[in-house]
Amino acid sequence: LKIIEDIETTPELLTTLTAYLLDHESSMANTAKALCCHINTIKYRLNSIRDNTGYSPSKPADVYPLLIAVAINRMKNSENE
């Protein structure tokens, strides 16, 4: 998917975005806990995602396209397993 192709080469960014949007209802604290890292690490990764994709995971107008992209990516990957 084009919107996330720039972060697909950095697995921790894609994992963070997927966990943040799909699994933890955009909670940085819950995402950090689930990924066993500090909340500042999540903030850094979300900023990196914004810088690489042009979409901010914390900006309401940008969340929908990111959410659709990671949901499709998850479904695509689950079909390949």
Task: Show the residue positions of the predicted features.
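Cytosolic nucleotide-utilizing catalytic cores of signal-transduction proteins
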Residues: 1-81
